[in-house]
């Protein structure tokens, strides 16, 4: 069996030109033009897929078999090209039978060429007639091949247009929620290319609307997600440099009384010592202390300053920004995190997903209560996983140590070794084991990993929260909620 691509190549048909015409026609459809006008950021993302579309269409041409009748006619044409006029005249009846059997569109024109009025019955086929016959036959085969190509491409166009409309509809709805910049729009478009989302995307829209009504929560996510720290790197084998410092030294020439000390200086003897010399019982004590240089005398000395030059190693510190790694977010799904806390935690994760898409990062969610459930929101099926995560209910106990252990194991993966760990909880839980605490501290000191805590309650246990580098508080109490709503309404 011969493929359509091979037939086009043998007939010297430029398939790239045909594919370009298909793409231009597809992009000019009113449906796509409307979406491009409404969502311009998605247009550039869609245009980046053009090479992929063409490759997909070429692959379809490679796998599409030519109909048997067309293949049989083309084989007969190839055999007719390699024979001379006499052999062609001999095989002409068989050629006409083949054209008739395959119901070739060229049959009528071939009969007209053979039975032309200017040709007498039994006249030999000339070289000119032979060439004209083959030329017209080739043109007929080319038209049939192009027609088959267009039928196939029309089917692909309808399939592709239907897929694009679904992707554009979904991406258009999610663009205000997840597409912060051109990079995010491109990644959102790539996420929509996964298998067609079977679940309702309404949870994404609902939590996106909830996040917009909670600007303080969104701002907190921005501060956490965009926070950067610097670390100092000492230069190895630093050279030495001259270091000048002023040094105060006592002068050798006495200038003024600077204190009292023990000595044998009779000229600067204190009056109390002279009193002992006038008492006969203490006279020997005076001479003993004189010999031992223990008499209290005034200290007279001056002060001078001089510049001292020493050498020390040059120590330069390079303040380098830590690269923005992926997010690993641990979400507490215990019963105490239900209700408004649950909605805030999910909306916060959605905000981190938005930041991850904009900054070309990855976002991994781990839910912990009595077990650990995992979602990667930026994978190929990230939208599907995000919908399942947002539809998850928060019920159960709190096993934070198991989640932190799973988080540390995840950070051992080379793809996640520079991740920022975020724990969202009310931190009303049991004390963490010393083994887990030591592992966290070891990563903080040796690998400079950062651990963030997002506290949804003011009643969290300090013994748990002290292991985190940063504690971001979002009070979900009724008073704080009313204050935020009042401030939000006042701003508008």
Curated annotation (Swiss-Prot):
CDD domains: VWA_YIEM_type. The keyword Cell membrane does not apply. Keywords: Chaperone, Cytoplasm. InterPro entries: Uncharacterised_CoxE, Uncharacterised_ViaA, VWF_A, vWFA_dom_sf. The keyword Chaperone applies. Its main location: cytoplasm. It is found in: Cytoplasm. GO terms for cellular component: cytosol. Belongs to the ViaA family. PANTHER family: PROTEIN VIAA. Homodimer. Interacts with RavA. HAMAP family: ViaA. Component of the RavA-ViaA chaperone complex, which may act on the membrane to optimize the function of some of the respiratory chains. ViaA stimulates the ATPase activity of RavA. This is Regulatory protein ViaA.
């Amino acid at each position: 069996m011969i493929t359509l691509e091979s037939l086009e190549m043998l007939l010297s048909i430029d398939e790239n030109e045909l594919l370009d015409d298909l793409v231009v026609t597809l992009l000019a459809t009113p449906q796509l033009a409307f979406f491009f006008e409404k969502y311009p950021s998605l247009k550039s993302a869609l245009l980046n897929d053009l090479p992929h579309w063409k490759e997909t269409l070429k692959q379809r041409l490679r796998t599409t078999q030519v109909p048997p009748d067309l293949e049989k006619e083309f084989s007969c044409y190839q055999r007719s090209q390699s024979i001379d006029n006499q052999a062609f005249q001999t095989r002409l009846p068989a050629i006409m039978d083949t054209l008739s059997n395959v119901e070739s569109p060229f049959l009528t024109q071939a009969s007209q060429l053979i039975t032309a009025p200017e040709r007498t019955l039994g006249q030999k086929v000339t070289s000119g007639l032979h060439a004209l016959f083959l030329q017209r036959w080739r043109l007929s085969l080319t038209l049939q091949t192009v027609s088959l190509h267009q039928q196939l491409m029309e089917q692909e166009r309808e399939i592709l247009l239907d897929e694009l409309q679904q992707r554009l509809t979904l991406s258009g709805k999610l663009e205000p929620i997840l597409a912060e910049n051109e990079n995010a729009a491109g990644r959102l478009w790539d996420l929509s290319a996964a298998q067609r989302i079977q679940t309702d995307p309404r949870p994404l829209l609902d939590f996106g609307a909830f996040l917009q009504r909670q600007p303080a929560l969104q701002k907190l996510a921005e501060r956490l997600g965009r926070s950067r720290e610097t670390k100092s790197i000492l230069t190895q084998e630093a050279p030495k440099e001259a270091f000048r410092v002023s040094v105060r030294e006592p002068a050798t020439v006495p200038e003024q009384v600077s204190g009292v000390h023990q000595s044998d200086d009779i000229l600067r003897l204190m009056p109390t010592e002279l009193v002992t010399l006038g008492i006969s019982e203490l006279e020997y004590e005076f001479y003993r202390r004189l010999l031992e240089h223990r008499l209290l005398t005034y200290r007279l000395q001056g002060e001078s300053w001089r510049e001292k030059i020493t050498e020390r190693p040059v120590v330069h510190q390079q303040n380098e920004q830590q690269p923005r790694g992926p997010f690993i977010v641990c979400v507490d799904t215990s019963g105490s995190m239900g209700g408004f806390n649950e909605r805030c935690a999910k909306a916060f994760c959605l905000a981190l997903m938005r930041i991850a898409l904009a900054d070309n990062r990855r976002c991994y969610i781990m839910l912990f209560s009595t077990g650990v459930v995992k979602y990667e929101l930026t994978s190929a099926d990230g939208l599907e996983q995000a919908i399942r995560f947002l539809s998850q209910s928060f019920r159960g106990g709190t096993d934070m140590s198991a989640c932190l252990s799973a988080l540390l194991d995840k950070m051992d993966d080379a793809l996640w070794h520079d991740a920022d760990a975020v724990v969202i909880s009310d931190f009303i839980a049991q004390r963490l084991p010393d083994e887990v605490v030591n592992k966290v501290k070891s990563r903080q000191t040796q690998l400079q990993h950062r651990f963030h805590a997002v506290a949804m309650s003011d009643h969290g246990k300090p013994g748990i929260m002290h292991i985190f580098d940063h504690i971001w508080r979002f009070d979900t109490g009724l008073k704080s909620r009313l204050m935020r709503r009042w401030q939000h309404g006042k701003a508008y």
